[in-house]
Swiss-Prot record:
The gene is MT-CYB. Component of the ubiquinol-cytochrome c reductase complex (complex III or cytochrome b-c1 complex) that is part of the mitochondrial respiratory chain. The b-c1 complex mediates electron transfer from ubiquinol to cytochrome c. Contributes to the generation of a proton gradient across the mitochondrial membrane that is then used for ATP synthesis. Belongs to the cytochrome b family. Heme 1 (or BL or b562) is low-potential and absorbs at about 562 nm, and heme 2 (or BH or b566) is high-potential and absorbs at about 566 nm. One of its GO terms (molecular function) is ubiquinol-cytochrome-c reductase activity. Heme b b566 binds at residues 97, 196. The chain crosses the membrane at residues 33-53, 77-98, 113-133, 178-198, 226-246, 288-308, 320-340, 347-367. This is Cytochrome b.
Length: 380
């Protein structure tokens, strides 16, 4: 068995990636989220495949086909809710994975980090298009509002929006193409994940100390396969509690009303995992400015290697930057809350303050804290 594992041209790639991979001996449970994201992707592809067998991407039957899946298909309700709540678990793992990378300075592995940002954009695009497919009220109006943002692009904006819509409004052509893209993107994401792993295995994993761990490595299997399996059990338990007890808690009640272009919902809002970016978008009165802020709220992650001023890699031994980091986490939670609130006083001013704080902490305060900590270290 060992000979096959180490000599077979295909199996040896798997062996070097998941079995004999040298891993730092001290990586904590924060390093579990990569494998959990892989599991989420597999769950989403499998449940999505079975949903696609029964779904019809036509405006007149899309809503009914989703109802049919829940009522008439064997365990259709389970597949549908696993897919919908699986997306939420996916984003929880994604945010924790990115947060871990920011905390421990993993962004210094630039190729892996940039690949991760591309993956984040791809997953967000996939989730947005998936939300449109049930063709409920929030699906329709969410699609209308978000695609309309592209009209803020000077000169080509309006043409671009109509090109994406396939007409002069969100209609049959839009739904069909969104279904096509929503189906193909997870497979593209899978390919990007392999590239992400390829870059990661070029440098090896980071660790909580931020120090070089070449002198102290252990094989991935059995140590981290067992450790990851515990994470898998916790994730699956969390997902099944959501699916079986609170399947609609993260959804919007408006999406149980079929799409009606003549009736606008009181508050148009995306799924919870986009609310922080939506709050940043809404906090700027200018349309183009809002769109740029929206894109920058994610793209700013690409600047982190340039904004790294500390002599140390992670925040493990840096209390000032740690404080800034946790204020940033609290700020993101405030933005998420504001994104789900109506556009009125006092939510407008809270959103604007939180948006300014978000960019200020990342671009100014954290790099400054790094320099202050360097000076404190030099004082000895």
């Amino acid at each position: 068995m060992t000979i096959i594992r180490k000599k077979h041209p295909l199996i040896k790639i798997i062996n070097h990636s998941f079995i004999d991979l040298p891993a730092p001996s001290n990586i904590s449970s924060w390093w579990n989220f990569g494998s959990l994201l892989g599991l989420c992707l597999i769950i989403q592809i499998l449940t999505g495949l079975f949903l696609a067998m029964h779904y019809t991407s036509d405006t007149s039957t899309a809503f009914s086909s989703v109802t049919h899946i829940c009522r008439d298909v064997n365990y259709g309700w389970l597949i549908r809710y696993m897919h919908a709540n699986g997306a939420s678990m996916f984003f929880i793992c994604l945010f924790l994975h990115v947060g871990r990378g920011m905390y421990y300075g993993s962004y210094n592995m630039i190729e892996t980090w940039n690949m991760g940002i591309i993956l984040l954009f791809a997953v967000m695009a996939t989730a947005f298009m998936g939300y449109v497919l049930p063709w409920g009220q929030m699906s329709f109006w969410g699609a209308t509002v978000i695609t309309n943002l592209l009209s803020a692009i000077p000169y080509i904006g309006t043409t671009l929006v109509e090109w994406i819509w396939g007409g002069f409004s969100v209609d049959k052509a839009t739904l069909t193409r969104f279904f096509a893209f929503h189906f193909i993107l997870p497979f593209i994401i899978t390919a990007l994940v392999l590239v992400h792993l390829l870059f990661l295995h070029e440098t090896g994993s980071n660790n909580p100390t931020g120090l070089n761990s070449d002198a102290d490595k252990i094989p991935f299997h059995p140590y981290y396969t067992i450790k990851d399996f515990l994470g898998v059990l916790i994730l699956l338990m969390g997902l099944m509690i959501l699916v079986l007890f609170f399947p609609d808690v993260l959804g919007d009640p408006d999406n149980y009303t079929p799409a009606n272009p003549l009736n606008t919902p009181a508050h148009i809002k995306p799924e919870w995992y986009f609310l922080f970016a939506y709050a940043i978008l809404r906090s700027i009165p200018n349309k183009l400015g809002g769109v740029l802020a929206l894109i920058l709220s994610i793209l700013i992650l690409a600047l982190l290697p340039l904004l790294h001023t500390s002599k140390q890699r992670g925040l493990t031994f840096r209390p000032i930057t740690q404080t800034m980091y946790w204020i940033l986490v609290a700020d993101l939670l405030i933005l998420t809350w504001i994104g789900g609130q109506p556009v009125e006083y006092p939510f407008i001013i809270i959103g604007q303050t939180a948006s300014i704080a978000y960019f200020t902490i990342i671009v100014i305060l954290m790099p400054m804290a790094g320099m202050i900590e360097n000076n404190i270290l030099d004082l000895d």
